[in-house]
């Protein structure tokens, strides 16, 4: 798998990868790079807002603001926000791994077999790391 220069490509806003193009050509890589970067930026923005909420709730809790019900609600909100932050951290790790695969020329290819994952699958799930068949087999074994 060869590294391809995708960072300097400006795509038309209506561009979508096509089967007629060479698989993981620079335009396709630029497309997925932009999608993944946008997802990462949105998550980082949302995560910062959640962390600010947690800080505020912790501040209120430590200051003893509100009655027992308010404090219980604050504690529940802190717990829920921390769980959500944990999930977003996991998602960020997957996005960063996908961006790294783009960088090293492995994006779009199965981490198991090296086979093409396929444009249709990547369009639906840009974080996919396996072919549909491999994913189904993985899910069966997991049960």
Sequence positions of predicted segments:
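Cysteine-rich micro-motifs
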Residues: 128-135
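Short functional micro-motifs and their immediate structural scaffolds
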Residues: 100, 117-118, 139
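Short cysteine-rich clusters marking metal-coordination/redox-active sites
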Residues: 110-114, 131
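Short Cys/His-rich "knuckle" micro-motifs
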Residues: 120-125
